[in-house]
UniProtKB/Swiss-Prot annotation:
It comes from the Eukaryota. Belongs to the INKA family. The gene is inka1-b. Residues 119-129 have a biased composition (Acidic residues). Transmembrane segments: none annotated. Residues 43-74, 108-130 are annotated as: Disordered. This is PAK4-inhibitor inka2. It is found in: Nucleus. The lineage of its organism: Eukaryota, Metazoa, Chordata, Craniata, Vertebrata.
Amino acid sequence: MHKSHLDSVAPQLRSDLQCIKASSSSLCDQMECMLRVLQDFKRSSPPPSPDIEKPCVVPPRRAPRRDNRISHRTSDLSEADSACCMDLPSDVSPGSCGQRGLEWDSGYSEVSGGSLRGEEDDIVEEESETSVPTVVLRRLPTPSCQRLSSGGFLNSRQGRIRPKSTSDVCLEQWRGIGLGSDSQDWTGCLLSQSRSRQPLVLGDNSFADLVKQWMDLPENVDEEGRRVRDGGRWLHKPHGFLISLSGNVKRRLGNMSRLRRSEQEAVKRMSCPQLGCRPLSLYYHQSLSDIAEASTNLLHCRSRQPIICNEGAGFL
């Protein structure tokens, strides 16, 4: 039985194998045909141009010229800062940039703010092909005595007025207050100007505030000489300070004492005495001695207010 079944399947398998061989041969023919087409396409295409094969060369970018920027910065620094100078190379004549020379003044200028080092880092040097001389900015070490002694305007070489520093302005302002103290009341100077630039607020301790602000004021030349001579004096202040108080301070002291007196008088006066501050109680609980003390206290009372007893009014 199995043999008969295998005999029936064998021709079917042969036919399948023949079909597979035929399909494989057709696939081989198709592959050969495709290879021929590709070779023909290569032969028919034009040869590649030599320009395409070369890589694209990007031209180098040159740094922008910064002559104007350097000149603007040096001019701004000459007007803003007062403790700088310019250091030029040896091949550059000093006449070209000499007019931009920066002169010193006393103190620390608010406009400069110590920004020279940051600006030096920002300046990019140009290439050697341009041959443009670079300007190097450096700060001159100014002696402390020169910085502290100068107090006026310093004129530059071009005749322009130099800006004052904050220390010079404050020094001149307080010197003017100290010199004009003879003609002007010092309390007016305190109320209008103070070292902290803050309005003077007078509170409960207004006298202490005035004294503290007065101690901060600069002294006159005569007072400074007296302070040097009398070095052991308490706080180096004149002896007649407490005696020569202005009328303004005296008026404020009088107002303070008057307010305290009015607060004391604001306490309500009782028409009858407090009977020795004894606690209030009913009348029939008190003894005869307490009633006698109450009558004596009423006799010594100076009030003229009516006392109503048994529906009858009378005055002591």
